[in-house]
C-alpha cells in the first residue's frame, strides 16, 4: 500500500523527457538562475563523473577545471530548474564513478571518445 503511494508521488515528480546521458560524457547543463526578479540560463560544461539515487531523487555530478582548480556541481535529473542537458562528447568508461579524475591534471583528465554506430 505505502509503496504504491510512494511510486505514484515519485512518478508525478519526474520529468517525462528526462535527459539521456552516461557517465564519462561531456555535457552542457543549462540551468535556470533567478537573480532578483530576472531569470537567466547559465551553462555548466563538464564531465559526468557519477550518478546516484533513483526516481525523482536521481542526481548527477559534473566536474570541470576552472583556472586550474577542479569544480564539481551536483544536479537533480528531474529538477524543473534544469532547462536541458546537451551531450557534447561521449567518453568510454569502465567504472560507475569516475572519482579517480579528481587526482589527475591536464591531459590525463581526458577520456577516450566512444564510437557512435
From Swiss-Prot:
Q: Does the record bear Ribonucleoprotein in its keywords?
A: yes
What does the UniProt record say this protein does?
This protein is located at the 30S-50S ribosomal subunit interface and may play a role in the structure and function of the aminoacyl-tRNA binding site.
Q: Which organism is it from?
A: Rhodopirellula baltica (strain DSM 10527 / NCIMB 13988 / SH1)
The molecule here is called: Large ribosomal subunit protein bL19
Assigned protein family = Belongs to the bacterial ribosomal protein bL19 family.
Q: List the disulfide bonds.
A: none
Q: One GO molecular-function annotation for this sequence?
A: structural constituent of ribosome
The Gene Ontology biological process annotation of the record reads: translation
Q: Name one GO cellular component term.
A: cytosolic large ribosomal subunit
- Name the Pfam families for this protein: Ribosomal_L19
The record, for InterPro entries, names: Ribosomal_bL19 (IPR001857), Ribosomal_bL19_CS (IPR018257), Ribosomal_bL19_sf (IPR038657), Translation_prot_SH3-like_sf (IPR008991)
| Keyword vocabulary terms for this entry | Ribonucleoprotein, Ribosomal protein
Domain of life where this protein originates: Bacteria
